[in-house]
Regions:
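Bacterial N-terminal signal peptides that target proteins for export
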Residues: 1-14
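Bacterial N-terminal signal peptides
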Residues: 11-24
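Mature N-terminal, pre-catalytic/accessory segment of carbohydrate-active enzymes
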Residues: 17, 28-59
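Substrate-binding cleft and catalytic face of glycoside hydrolase catalytic domains
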Residues: 70-284
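Catalytic-core region of carbohydrate-active enzymes that cleave or remodel glycosidic bonds
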Residues: 275, 280-355, 365-381, 418-420, ...
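Carbohydrate-binding surface patches
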Residues: 395-436, 469-473
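Solvent-exposed beta-hairpin/edge-strand motifs
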Residues: 430-448
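C-terminal beta-strand-rich structural cap/linker in extracellular carbohydrate-active enzymes
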Residues: 455-480
Length: 480
């Protein structure tokens, strides 16, 4: 039998052990507390347009609307809409003849290719039958118009597959006949979409990554600048002659990430485009964004919009959680003020491209939505549309956060944790809102932008758990 002394000592030992365990746990927990105090001074506004580049396996407006995008980028050009010379006579009609009488163009060809494309698909040029979406260009553009989603169309003579073969002779254009064909194609595209029809397509890109030979441009930088000048003349003629009350935008120079072509374009042809548009696949897009902004400063494009026409990935699956979280961080970076700011963007790409070896999109075969889709959707909820932005007074080294206010004065708080460590976050948004109920959404390996609970503000403060490798979005409804 144990003596009373031994029993007492054993009991005390157990108490000490329990106390140490509890203390240890509490100490560890305390180390994982982060306090975020949001400034009451607006830093600026969030990115106005967040959209996606098309993919060829599908086009379903329900995906675009559920994702919340308000712009959609489309690869136009000769391979898609003029795979054969539309009139069969190279170099005819001339630019002056078209300006005098636009009906000299073979509009029967354009009506047919836009309405009854080969193999029943506007993507016939990019994939095998049975692997691409079934539908025509009319459906795409009319659907975007009805949904108030802003299309941005790239016009190319030759695509990344160096097609169509007949257009190789004007890649780059050299002769008068070459320039006639290029001018006619640009004119016909813009005229068909906006004059012959009314699809409200007012954003135009001239080629795609002209500094990347794999994308089909066969000329030099100087040749590309001439291509832009002639395209500008064709586009400008359509609007001044037939759409005098409409504003159009030419995006340029549409170059690869890290390229120095934008600097040259801003010096040599700044009056032939009005929206600076570059590609940027960096993990942190802000570094190159700042460089391009620096080039814009001191030119006539200093106050012009800056768009990122492609970002995200074409190498890694959008099912990757780390990549998905970084999408949210880059959306936040694009809404930061000053030289980090991005006016509009298109992630590459919404849908898979059906050709073997090409990129995965946010949405795969059978409508499967990947993690990146839900991550971007969360970022769009908080940031798209030019909302007033507010950032932490002191930035956390571990978390990235931003708050926004929408037109109804509701407040959004978005916090991203791309580390394995979990946190308790004490958020102070008292400078923006004092009381209100918050709906909490979580993005993580377990929750894909799903509602997980509610919070009530107390004096503008709220606490919540933030799991490792996750993001939280809280929408606080303004009480009347």
């Amino acid at each position: 039998m144990l003596s009373k002394t031994r029993i007492l000592n054993l009991f005390l030992g157990i108490l000490i052990a329990l106390s140490l365990e509890l203390f240890s746990g509490t100490t560890t927990f305390a180390q994982n507390i982060e306090t975020i105090k949001i400034s009451g001074t607006a830093a600026g506004i969030s990115t106005r347009y967040i959209g996606a580049v098309e993919g060829n396996i599908n086009f379903d407006i329900k995906d675009l609307q559920d994702l919340g995008i308000n712009t959609y980028r489309i690869y136009g050009g000769m391979s898609r809409w003029e795979a054969e010379d539309d009139d069969g006579k190279y170099g005819w009609p001339s630019i002056d003849e078209i300006k005098t009488n636009p009906n000299i163009i073979n509009w029967a060809h354009w009506d047919r290719i836009m309405t009854d494309p080969p193999q029943g698909s506007d993507y016939w040029w990019s994939g095998q039958p049975g692997t691409v979406w079934q539908g025509n260009a009319r459906t795409i553009f009319n659907t975007l118009k009805q949904a108030n989603i802003r299309p941005v169309v790239s016009i190319r003579n030759v695509d990344s597959g160096w097609k169509p073969s007949w257009a190789l002779q004007l890649n780059p254009p050299r002769t008068g006949e070459d320039w006639n064909e290029w001018w006619e194609h640009v004119f016909a595209t813009v005229y068909w979409l906006n004059v012959r029809n009314d699809y409200r397509v007012d954003d135009w890109e001239i080629h795609n990554e002209p500094d990347n030979r794999d994308q089909g441009w066969g000329g030099t930088r100087a040749d590309y600048f001439e291509l832009v000048k002639v395209a500008k003349d064709a586009i400008d003629f359509v609007y001044k002659t037939y759409l005098p009350d409409r504003t159009y935008r030419i995006h340029g120079p549409k170059t690869v990430g890290g390229s120095n072509w934008p600097e040259a374009a801003l010096q040599e042809i700044p009056n032939y485009f009005d929206t600076v548009n570059v590609h940027n696949y960096d993990a942190d897009i802000s570094n190159y964004t700042r460089k391009v902004r620096g080039w814009m400063n001191g030119t006539v494009r200093a106050n012009s919009q800056l768009w990122v026409g492609e970002w995200g990935t074409y190498e890694i699956s959008y099912g990757d959680l780390s990549l998905a979280l970084n999408l949210i961080k880059n959306v936040i970076r694009g809404s930061q003020p000053g030289d980090n700011y991005i006016d509009g963007s298109h992630i590459f790409c919404l849908y898979d491209w059906g050709k073997l070896g090409l990129a995965e999109g946010l949405v795969g075969e059978g409508g499967k939505r990947r993690a990146g889709y839900y991550a971007l959707r969360m970022g769009i909820r908080a940031l798209q549309g030019g909302k007033a932005t507010f950032f932490p007074i002191t930035n956390s080294s571990d978390l990235m956060a931003v708050a926004t206010i929408d037109a109804s004065k509701n407040v959004y708080l978005l916090v991203v944790n791309d580390r394995a460590t979990s946190y308790t976050v004490n958020a102070d948004i008292s400078e923006l809102i004092k009381t209100g109920n918050g709906t909490v959404r979580e993005f993580s390996s377990q929750r894909m932008d799903e509602v997980v609970g509610n919070l009530r503000l107390k004096g503008g403060n709220a606490s919540f758990a933030l799991a490792g490798n996750s993001a939280i979005l809280i929408k606080f409804d303004r009480q009347n």
